[in-house]
Amino acid sequence: MNQELLSVGSKRRRTGGSLRGNASSSQVDEEQMNRVVEEDPQQQPRHQEEEHTARNGELVGADPRPGAQNDSQQGQVEENNNRFVSVDEDSSGNQEEQEEDEEHAGEQEEEEEEEEEEEEEEEMDQESDDFDQSDDSSREDEHTHNSNVTNCTSVVDLPINQLSSPFYTKTTKMKRKLDHGSEVRSFSLGKKPCKVSDYTSTTGLVPCSATPTTFGDLRAANGQGQQRRRITSVQPPTGLQEWLKMFQSWSGPEKLLALDELIDSCEPTQVKHMMQVIEPQFQRDFISLLPKELALYVLSFLEPKDLLQAAQTCRYWRILAEDNLLWREKCKEEGIDEPLHIKRRKIIKPGFIHSPWKSAYIRQHRIDTNWRRGELRSPKVLKGHDDHVITCLQFCGNRIVSGSDDNTLKVWSAVTGKCLRTLVGHTGGVWSSQMRDNIIISGSTDRTLKVWNAETGECIHTLYGHTSTVRCMHLHEKRVVSGSRDATLRVWDIETGQCLHVLMGHVAAVRCVQYDGRRVVSGAYDFMVKVWDPETETCLHTLQGHTNRVYSLQFDGIHVVSGSLDTSIRVWDVETGNCIHTLTGHQSLTSGMELKDNILVSGNADSTVKIWDIKTGQCLQTLQGPSKHQSAVTCLQFNKNFVITSSDDGTVKLWDLKTGEFIRNLVTLESGGSGGVVWRIRASNTKLVCAVGSRNGTEETKLLVLDFDVDMK
């Protein structure tokens, strides 16, 4: 369907953007051919000259006979004639000036309209080019499509001398085949064709009949019955009607064979005439004949890149392709939640409605292109925490929060790179943190949690209760669950600072925790994973199977995924507590994981990253090869397109989520391999924040902020 739509659009664009261009060019060619078979064209000017002379004689009205009038009458006539000529010259001069002014004004308007149209076309071309440049495979598909379109129209563009060449005649004879069956069209994957029975015949459309109709009937049904070519200067040849009756009496294959022989016996000009009559019938813009709702439904099957190309076909197609609801659906497919409202550089013409959803889609596409191959500009460098380790990192909106074993947290601006404030109050190193809006929560080796106001830096609450280091926490709305080396978990109200529940059952330090508002899931050094009901403080399930410490957890409300020092990853059913899959393949500790829509990405101390489908338990990709990390993976994050990973080797790498292919290094520390480490990474749609440093003093502790945003004017 995509190629059929675009082939119509490509032909229309090459011929002037409308079918009227084809009709006008065909009409000119037909008139030229008429003049070949009509009478001598010089006779018409001679008749016009005689008529003009006769009219002049009648208008002058002068008697050529001498003595017919006296001198006074003759003088009066001359005076009147002179006065008439003078007035006529003045009026004609004014009229000419007025016509020149009007013509000049019209030319200016036309030039302005042409300039606006050129700007619109350039803008659409740029949007389409952005999509073309983003994917090599897309460019190959487009090249193949353009080749197909060119092949379909190459006969039309051939000069007459090529049409009459022996090579052309030979190849056309070889290529022409009798096709007695119906044409079978395939549809792209995921795109289901509309059933004809689902729609009634619309006004202006020709319903498909069960029996074949003649080409003349088709032209008449299309409203072009009066446009049929009539050569009136030549009488119908003798026996024409008998020949036509004989032709109609033949079978379908016999008619095709006869047409083949007829075409081979025609001269090039005659073949061209047939093409001019037939071709417009197959270039009809069926989209413009459909009701708008149905036309938009058809266009909704196009990919965004093809939709942008379709917008360049004509004005009506561009209006359809700018439909805001159409682009909203495209945005939903890509996970874009909000439209983009921007200031336009120029006023949109009446009839063209700017689509904020389209702008949002194009902006996101350009951002993805920046991540993939955009120029890596110098990052903002945020220096702080001296030479201490950055143990935790949060990034939300334009605010960055870093926690360190120097007992402090720092709040940074992701826009300016400035340190906005330092949160001081803990008496031990900060090892865990969470952030939402203007609230920051931190856990420390001093056995407390603190709730901070990110705007003012004020400590709102200090939460006491744990008897050892607060090693992990998870925030959900107004509650936070903390896990400690004292083997317990506590549920806190961050608004009041009260401890609501205490969950006891582990026999070793709690290393990781997840909370969805209903259930708490915890992993500990006792090899166990536990599922809790925090309201009743009861353990619903103890998930046994790991043979070493549990270091990482993910929980989506249905599945629990646990990573252990025993090198395995286990997928559990949270309702039954059963182990669904055991994912094997890593060779060491799984230090970090992230789960979205049944896709799990795991990073391991064996320097590899794996992508899994937790429903099937299948490993989809292993991110390795010559460009893989050379040391343990420290942190990772992924979205619908990319996987970002950091490592002890001092690099941050970008990978393709679908193919597993390495794209490029986003960060490479000069001290990488000799002590430089990327401890933590956090990424938004447009920014990447990296916490870097070293354990031997070779790399200064700092934050690096990379920006991949685009300017949508």
Swiss-Prot record:
The modification Phosphothreonine is found at T211. WD repeats lie at residues 384-424, 426-462, 465-504, 506-542, 545-584, 586-624, 628-665. Pfam families: F-box-like, WD40. It is found in: Nucleus, Nucleoplasm; Chromosome. Residues 46-55, 136-145 have a biased composition (Basic and acidic residues). Phosphorylation at Thr-211 promotes interaction with PIN1, leading to disrupt FBXW7 dimerization and promoting FBXW7 autoubiquitination and degradation. Phosphorylated by ATM at Ser-26 in response to DNA damage, promoting recruitment to DNA damage sites and 'Lys-63'-linked ubiquitination of phosphorylated XRCC4. Ubiquitinated: autoubiquitinates following phosphorylation at Thr-211 and subsequent interaction with PIN1. Ubiquitination leads to its degradation. One of its GO terms (cellular component) is perinuclear region of cytoplasm. Residues 69-84 have a biased composition (Polar residues). SMART domains: FBOX, WD40. The modification Phosphoserine is found at S26, S233. Residues 94-136 form a coiled coil. Keywords: Biological rhythms, Chromosome, Coiled coil, DNA damage, DNA repair, Nucleus, Phosphoprotein, Repeat, Ubl conjugation, Ubl conjugation pathway, WD repeat. Transmembrane segments: none annotated. Pathway: Protein modification; protein ubiquitination. Residues 1-150 are annotated as: Disordered. Residues 284-330 form the F-box domain. The WD repeats mediate interaction with substrates of the SCF (SKP1-CUL1-F-box protein) E3 ubiquitin-protein ligase complex. Substrate recognition component of a SCF (SKP1-CUL1-F-box protein) E3 ubiquitin-protein ligase complex which mediates the ubiquitination and subsequent proteasomal degradation of target proteins. Recognizes and binds phosphorylated sites/phosphodegrons within target proteins and thereafter brings them to the SCF complex for ubiquitination. Identified substrates include cyclin-E (CCNE1 or CCNE2), JUN, MYC, NOTCH1 released notch intracellular domain (NICD), NOTCH2, MCL1, MLST8, RICTOR and probably PSEN1. This is F-box/WD repeat-containing protein 7. It comes from Rattus norvegicus. The gene is Fbxw7.
